[in-house]
Amino acid sequence: MGDKIFHNLSSKTLVATPHVITKGIYHKSLIYMLSHTEEGAIGLIFNRLVNHIDLKSFFKIKNDDITTPVMVPIYLGGPVEHEKGFFLHSSDYNKNLLLDFQNDLAVSSNLEISEDIAFGKGPKNSLFIVGYTAWKPGQLEEELERNLWLVMDCNKEFIFADNPEDKWHSALKHLGIDEIYFSAQIGNA
């Protein structure tokens, strides 16, 4: 057998296949891939809304100019390190970026962006995500071979759409797939 060809999925979106991942955090999840190398992969689930938080109290922003709560949705990015928070956001905001992508998206993980969002000076679009998803070397490739994920190009309007519950169905529709045509037995051609 020959060597497997590695396809970098950084900046792509993974779409959980129906009836294969049937429960848990990955059921009907969408994951924006932050990094994918031969050493492993890291991504953020962006459609698993868990709550809303007040940025001012959550980040202990001390400023009397903000008199009302600044409520933002909080998403669960995956099962790893829930104490870590990330802002997946549009690239119009470029202060102290953790990651900057070519598809008009960026990731920040610092207090400054939360303050800027609270003051209305942050990015046009953003999601606050806690935790992340990670794969060991070869693990994601194995899951792709087992048809646990579909891969699609990233679309920032899709990521920042208002209704997180509809994003997975919208992703299937974008791929030209109707969920009812999936069976529990799917395979590679």
Curated annotation (Swiss-Prot):
Signal peptide residues on this chain, from the entry's feature table: none
Pfam family, one: DUF179
Family annotation (SUPFAM superfamilies): VC0467-like
InterPro entries found in the cross-reference section: AlgH-like (IPR003774)
Top-rank taxon, per record: Bacteria
Family of this protein: Belongs to the UPF0301 (AlgH) family.
Protein name: UPF0301 protein A1C_00165
Organism for this UniProt entry: Rickettsia akari (strain Hartford)
